[in-house]
């Protein structure tokens, strides 16, 4: 498995726990986040941790699974399209790509509804006004793209069985598979 934008290794850790024989490669640009991933995977010989910018990196090897969680939305649209092509090339035949990420809402009305629901939910969790403001400030750096566009870009890159597997408000899990032939 290749985990793009792996951060502290949370997603890769869940996969490694569920599939103990899996070989896992984590890529992230943040040395600070990867330091926590190194702690998480201390003593594991089958885990490779690489500090690099995956948006421009060429991936070596073939992977059965490539996944990313809450990272690709930081890329511009043309970078997403390029990344999807490179992901396809790095997958083994029949391999799958899964992206769990925020997407752009297709209408202003839905955006208002989703925003109100998000604020309600995080407020119930005890998020303070300052924390909410900080989250909104971080979101200014996001480069969200509509889900429909990203599904189309996956198909254009050559993925098959492209679909959205889960969606709640702006959060979606989607991906596709590399053809066998």
Task: Identify the function of each model-found stretch.
Residues 81-93:
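A short glycine-rich, Lys/Arg-flanked "PGG" loop and its adjoining helix->strand segment in the class I
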Residues 2, 8-56:
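Class I SAM-dependent methyltransferase SAM/SAH-binding core
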Residues 100-156:
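C-terminal alpha-helical "lid/dimerization" subdomain adjacent to the S-adenosyl-L-methionine
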Residues 160-181:
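Core SAM-dependent methyltransferase catalytic element
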Residues 18, 73-75:
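A short His-aromatic
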Residues 59-66:
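A short acidic, Gly/Pro-enriched loop at the edge of an enzyme's catalytic core
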């Amino acid at each position: 498995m290749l985990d793009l934008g792996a951060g502290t290794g949370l997603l890769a850790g869940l996969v490694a726990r569920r599939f103990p024989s899996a070989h896992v490669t984590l890529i992230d640009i943040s040395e600070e986040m990867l330091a926590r991933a190194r702690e998480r995977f201390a003593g594991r010989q089958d885990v490779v941790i690489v500090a690099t910018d995956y948006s421009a990196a060429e991936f070596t090897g073939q992977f059965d699974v490539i996944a990313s969680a809450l990272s690709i939305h930081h890329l511009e649209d043309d970078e997403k399209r390029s990344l999807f092509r490179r992901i396809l090339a790095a997958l083994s035949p029949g391999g799958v790509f899964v992206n769990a990420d925020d997407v752009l809402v297709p209408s202003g009305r839905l955006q208002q509804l989703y925003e109100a629901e998000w604020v309600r939910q995080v407020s119930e969790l005890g998020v303070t006004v300052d924390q909410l403001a900080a989250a909104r400030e971080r979101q200014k750096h996001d480069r969200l793209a509509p889900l429909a566009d990203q599904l189309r870009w996956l198909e254009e890159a050559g993925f098959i069985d492209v679909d959205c597997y889960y969606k709640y408000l702006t959060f979606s899990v989607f991906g596709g598979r590399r053809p066998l032939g």
